[in-house]
């Protein structure tokens, strides 16, 4: 059974990203899926203030775009040589918003990104982009922990089923499918988590 047909991977330049790319390629190959690797340039750093509209800064912006595009192409060239259907795409804007827009435009059925902590208890594993995607992305999001073994001893699947919401149940089923498949592949322990709010708890 091929669970995923159109996978989206968020690229980054960290040394650990090679492991994340390998995971994405392995999954795409097993599912005979198309893989799209994207990088996102945040435009707000370029478009605020009069000075950023000057010719030198426009030239610098074009240089950065060219560099990022070349980095992206270099990263996926070995994958193309293996015969996998893989594309590169550069997006502009706020990362989590552009990823969600890309998912909606191209009907991606899975998003993969590296875990990037940003300090604090919550930031030990998930950065703000991952948290936004897990809350708002309309397809499953696989956040890959880097820096350890290539095989995982524990996998967590966060589900949010709702008897009155068919779309939410469908998304939870897809997440469970992916988590089960990965746990079998790595012979991992699978943990399924769900949180809920008690109606009226704010007035207790």
What spans do the regions from the language model cover?
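Structural beta-alpha unit
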Residues: 1-3, 16, 23-26, 66, ...
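Small/aliphatic-rich secondary-structure junction motif
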Residues: 2-55, 154-204
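Short beta-strand elements of ligand-binding domains
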Residues: 113-115, 141-146
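Short, structured coil segments at secondary-structure junctions
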Residues: 129, 137-138
